[in-house]
Design a protein with these regions (language model features):
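Core catalytic region of metal-dependent phosphoesterases/phosphodiesterases
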Residues: 1-94, 153-157
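A structural signal for the main folded, soluble domain(s) of proteins
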Residues: 5-12, 111, 118-119, 168, ...
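Glycine-rich phosphate-binding loop signature in dinucleotide/nucleotide-binding domains
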Residues: 11-16, 121-124, 196-198
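Receiver (REC) domain switch-region micro-motif
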Residues: 20, 128, 160
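Active-site glycine-centered loops adjacent to acidic/histidine catalytic or metal-binding residues
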Residues: 24-25, 61-62, 131, 163-164, ...
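Active-site regions of enzymes building and remodeling cell-envelope glycoconjugates
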Residues: 85-86, 100-102, 125-126, 172-177
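Binuclear metal-dependent hydrolase catalytic cores centered on His/Asp/Glu-rich metal-binding motifs
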Residues: 97-152
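Conserved beta-sheet core of the metallophosphoesterase superfamily
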Residues: 134, 140-199
Length: 199
């Protein structure tokens, strides 16, 4: 609450920011959300976005998807339909924000894998916003993931910004942005925040 009330929304207002990109894992549990958590999410995040006319692009992350093989049934879609300012992505998509072409890549799973990799190959967009599991990056401070996709398939892009891992790290053109605030003890004394993408 303190992060949203005292940091995030005041910054957006002060700098006239009218678009937010959420890189996934907005919700934590695949199968359910408590009423208390949903009420808090609406009060702290979704309602202020709506009240301030902020268009919000939300990628489906692995924690948002109910099943492991498809993103189609997901908490983002089910819990944000009442907000016309929120656009949910469970399939890869190309969009344009402020004159900048972006490839939006939600969690890559069996259902969207072929389409995702074809779009990575064919797109003319130079920037990817994703929820990617790439090997060789730190999930948490000091814990390197040895599984996942090879990051070299993204070499053609100028910049890749991705969610999924809590630890902020950069290697070449790939930027794991980390989570905005501490969520577990693994995040203790690990830099947190949000990022501004100036189009």
């Amino acid at each position: 609450k303190k992060f949203y009330d005292e940091v995030f929304f005041p910054y957006l207002k002060e700098h006239n920011i009218n678009t937010v990109i959420d890189l996934g894992d907005t919700f934590d549990r695949r199968k359910y959300i408590s009423f208390t958590s949903l009420k808090a999410a609406k009060a702290m995040f979704f309602e202020p976005l709506k009240e301030n006319n902020i268009t919000t692009h939300m990628l489906v992350g692995n924690h948002d998807a109910v099943y492991r093989n498809t993103n189609e049934l997901n908490s983002v879609y089910l819990l944000t339909q009442e907000y016309p300012n929120i656009i949910e992505y469970h399939q890869p998509s190309e969009i344009n924000i402020g004159g900048c072409d972006l490839l939006m890549l939600p969690w890559i799973c069996k259902d969207n894998e072929k389409q995702s990799y074809q779009m990575i190959k064919d797109t003319t967009a130079q920037i990817v916003m994703g929820h990617l599991e790439l090997k060789g990056f730190q999930m948490n401070k000091g814990y390197v993931i040895q599984e996942g996709a090879d990051h070299t398939i993204y070499d053609k892009f100028d910049m890749v910004c991705t969610g999924h891992y809590h630890h902020k790290s950069t290697e070449k053109n790939i930027n794991y942005l980390g989570c905005p605030y501490e969520m577990t003890w693994m995040d203790y004394e690990d830099p947190k925040g949000f990022h501004i993408f100036d189009t």
